[in-house]
């Protein structure tokens, strides 16, 4: 692997943006990965961020054409900080010529919130993994009645969105309430490549936003008695991987397209 990608780690208190300094980050290639196998030790600064480091990645060309080998390398990350629970993140995805950003929401040792796991396993990108195909929906379909008794005059961009980490038929799967802007970036990082041209990334983000706002505006799941807005099953909605790494190129495009035009 002659090509290089980059990684920055960000550590915050729980689901806030309060930085955690002095956090130790231990990074190593995932099992079966080529290249250097040595551990890399990093420490967060007063902003809760590590320095940006270069890591081995497959050739850039792999991400530009279909039917090529997996275009990203995988790394496992362990986060340690006194006063907080350890966090393990397996399968951080590094593309050539791309900056990956790994957010780490650390739980204080005295906090035992059940919805937050200590281990995050990042699933393959949908272009590489084995995911169920989208179940076709009728173009004109009856909409469930609004749960509030009030019909919104136009789509509203929410501050938060609740994601069900499973199919609609899996009531045991956890729900995650995350900032809407972070949800869009997470979905894009799951479904497209960060190395694509800016115009291609933008077109995909438009599609993700449109579909997501439709689910919220129509109260597609809440109108059926569910306690969430959307699922992470590709058979019904978008892929979403709680706690996965994001990308600077995707975040930059998302930032300018997360509100509706006036």
Segments predicted by a language model, with ranges:
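Extracellular beta-sheet/turn segments enriched in Thr/Pro/Gly and aliphatic residues
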Residues: 87, 92-129
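Acidic/histidine-rich, surface-exposed loop or edge segments in extracytoplasmic proteins
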Residues: 166-168, 179-196
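Short, acidic Ser/Thr/Gly-rich low-complexity loop/linker segments typical of extracellular
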Residues: 33-63
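Second-shell loop/turn segments in exported
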Residues: 189-201, 237-243
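Beta-strand-rich domain onsets/edges
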Residues: 1-7, 12-19, 42
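A short, solvent-exposed loop/turn motif at the edges and junctions
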Residues: 60-90
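Short, ordered, surface-exposed loop/turn motifs in non-cytosolic proteins
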Residues: 15-39
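Conserved small/polar residues in nucleotide/adenosyl-binding loops
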Residues: 256-262
């Amino acid at each position: 692997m002659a090509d290089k990608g980059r990684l920055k780690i960000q550590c915050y208190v729980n689901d806030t943006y309060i930085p955690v300094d002095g956090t130790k980050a231990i990074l190593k290639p995932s099992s079966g990965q080529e290249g250097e196998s040595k551990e890399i030790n990093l420490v967060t600064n007063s902003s809760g961020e590590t320095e940006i480091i270069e890591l081995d990645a497959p050739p850039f060309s792999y991400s530009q054409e279909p039917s090529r080998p997996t275009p990203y390398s995988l790394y496992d990350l362990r986060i340690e900080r006194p006063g907080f629970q350890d966090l393990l993140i397996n399968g951080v995805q590094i593309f050539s010529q791309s900056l990956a950003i790994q957010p780490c929401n650390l739980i204080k040792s005295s906090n035992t919130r059940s919805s937050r796991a200590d281990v995050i396993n990042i699933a393959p990108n949908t272009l590489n993994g084995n995911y169920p195909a989208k179940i076709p929906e009728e173009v004109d379909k009856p909409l469930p009645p609004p749960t509030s008794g009030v019909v919104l005059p136009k789509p509203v961009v929410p501050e938060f969105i609740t994601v069900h980490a499973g199919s609609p038929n899996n009531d045991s799967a956890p729900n995650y309430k995350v900032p809407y802007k972070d949800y869009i970036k997470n979905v894009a990082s799951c479904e497209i490549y960060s190395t694509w041209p800016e115009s291609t990334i933008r077109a995909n983000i438009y599609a993700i936003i449109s579909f997501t706002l439709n689910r919220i505006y129509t109260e597609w799941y809440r109108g059926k008695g569910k306690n969430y807005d959307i699922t992470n099953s590709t058979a019904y909605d978008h892929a979403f991987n709680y706690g996965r790494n994001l990308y600077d190129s995707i975040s930059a495009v998302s930032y300018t397209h997360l509100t509706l035009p006036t």
